[in-house]
Amino acid sequence: MALCLANSLVACHGFNAYDQLVRYKWWYKFGYMSATGRCFDIGTGTRQSLLEFERRQNIFAKKFNTPFTDMDRLSDSELLQKFDVYCSDHGVAGNGALTGLAPVPLFFYREPPVAVEYSGVSGQITHGDTTAYDACRYYGALIVAALQGYEKEQLLDDNFYQKHKEWFSIKRLHHEIESISRGSYKKSGYDAGIRGKGYIVNALEAALWAFWSDDNSFEKGALAAVNLGDDTDTTAAIYGQLAGA
């Protein structure tokens, strides 16, 4: 999905949520951008959102007398504005929203408020809960800061969010994400309750714990993320986006 997102940003010369969903659908149905030529290990929330997206395409095509076969290439700006791209049910807060986030802050890092907002939207179109939106906004902000040359200690500052509130506009972070921003992950790891679970709050906390405790070793951090168990590959993928920046 990260490759689909990156491809969309480049092809569209910017953020186009509809085009992103089209490419995610191609991945799901045809293996687009997959190393194996097929989709594998898609999360429940993502799958349901893509099925809903295709259902809405069908309805939209009939309403506006557009051949369904043309819907994936829809480019009319007025029609695109009428299409509701938020295809997730409310309350969906899986870790998949964070897994492929990095292309957004990479593309927009020179404009932090834009990067942060689009980071949130990129997750919310498939994972509709506020926690998913805010987890993506916060993590996107950290990646932006890393790309702008911030030191690790600055990224892990318990007051990072407070010091960069202008990046988040007037939308305050969800209280669970704000707790993470204040360092809730800074504890002894698995024995202290850190888990790489499917809930996005747990996943974000686990990835940041691995980053905080990796002694500046990517290998150590990735192994620590995996060794937390549960959804190991996703935790490591989230960790790697920030650690690799």
Where are these regions (language model features)?
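Structured, active/binding-site neighborhoods that engage oxygen-rich ligands
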Residues: 1-245
